[in-house]
């Protein structure tokens, strides 16, 4: 799940869903990993993929038919999903405070967040390599 740990004002509150977010975080039957990383890493500005690449097209349309770098929140979540502990550390020494004031403690094996193992510049290079290279 993408969202901030302390009173996230975007991902966990969109569409007036704070109570739904609370229910999901409390009752989801498998481990949940929270990621709030990527806001300081801009990727995708040098897309060298083929013109029919869906990644290239998404960046192009997002920026009104031009190429610019974008914050990498989504890319961090995907990178964790496919590369996992090789690129991030799972931690549970914190808690989440939702906008409605509810506090949820992290629990090993159930509710974690990820912490970086590398510098933002290193993540930028990895993500750009994966999304910007030409198809082979």
Label every model-predicted segment.
Residues 1-136:
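N-terminal acidic, glycine/proline-rich low-complexity segments
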């Amino acid at each position: 799940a993408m969202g901030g740990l302390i009173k996230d004002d975007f991902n966990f509150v969109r569409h007036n869903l704070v109570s739904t977010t609370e229910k999901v975080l409390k009752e989801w039957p498998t481990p949940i990993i929270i990621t709030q990383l990527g806001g300081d890493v801009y990727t995708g500005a040098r897309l060298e993929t083929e013109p029919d690449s869906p990644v290239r097209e998404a960046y192009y349309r997002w920026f009104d038919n031009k190429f610019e770098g974008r914050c990498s929140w989504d890319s961090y979540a995907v990178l964790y999903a496919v590369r996992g502990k090789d690129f991030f550390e799972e931690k549970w020494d914190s808690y989440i405070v939702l906008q409605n004031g509810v506090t949820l403690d992290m629990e090993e094996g159930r509710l974690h967040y990820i912490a970086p193992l590398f510098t933002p510049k290193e993540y930028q290079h990895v993500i750009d390599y994966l999304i910007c290279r030409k198809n082979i």
